[in-house]
Amino acid sequence: MARSYGGRVLAAMTLLGIAAAVLAALGAQLLFQLQAGRAELRGLRAEGLGQELGAGPGLPEDAAGTLLPLAAALAALVLVLGFTCLLLAALCGHLGAELARGPGPRRSDWFLYDCRLLRHVALGLFCCGISVYLAALSIYALLLFEIETGAAAASILGSGTLVLVAVLTHTLLRAARAARRGLHELSPPSFEDDLARPAEVSKASPRAQPQQGIHRRTPYSTCPEPGDPFGSMATATAPAALEGGWESSLPASRMHRTLSAGLGHWDGVTHEMRRMLGHRPGSMGKDSTLV
């Protein structure tokens, strides 16, 4: 089964933390070796062998005295960079693991995806630590070996340091450009598919609401006039017809047209009868003879 985005990030941060711990250990070891070499050099000078050291094939005394503090400072910088990278990796991994234990399996994925800048900083510190360590190691090679051997080792280590710095700069610039593009232009991880489902449901729910409103709407609305027996009869028979199953057999629009046509015919008959009764000749006394 393929790992999730958070699992892959946690595995990468674990490996980065292990490498940063190894780098910090190498920096501390180099720092102690330089300190021991400096104490040994001072002991040789105290014994009266300074002239022999100055005349030997190694570096001159003034150059060695200048390069030793520089190499020690670089080794201390390597130690600081390694510990900083280790702490960042451990912090990011710990927070991601704690969020994964909480409710919602995608919380840690979102956290690790949002803190990608922190991961880039940790990786940059690690690469800078390696470059500084190679520079300090080249100086230590000049101090430890003879001039020819030390120069060859220092040149190789220095060229490797320059190549590593160039690759590091190019990689960090590309990572910064990718971070500026935003979430929509980056390659989306697998957990973004889960967010599309609530959006589709929210788009489909307004479509279902008008359909429910159509079913709830009555197919007709008539208001019978007072004293109109036909209107009251139509109003009384319409619900009975709907209960008898007309709604299932006829559409709402067709039923509405049929009822409107029938009611219109009876309205014409009642209107004609009222007009004839309204224009009766004679007075009230003559009306009694008609009865």
UniProtKB/Swiss-Prot annotation:
Cellular localisation: Membrane
Membrane topology annotation: Multi-pass membrane protein
Pfam families attached to this UniProt entry: Jiraiya
Transmembrane segments: 12-32, 70-90, 125-145, 153-173
Keywords: Membrane, Transmembrane, Transmembrane helix
Disulfide cross-links: none
Domain of life: Eukaryota
Any one Gene Ontology cellular component term annotated for this protein: membrane
Record bears the keyword Amino-acid biosynthesis: no
Position of the signal peptide: none
Residue numbers spanned by region Disordered: 189-219
Record-given protein name: Transmembrane protein 221
Organism: Homo sapiens
Lineage of the organism: Eukaryota, Metazoa, Chordata, Craniata, Vertebrata
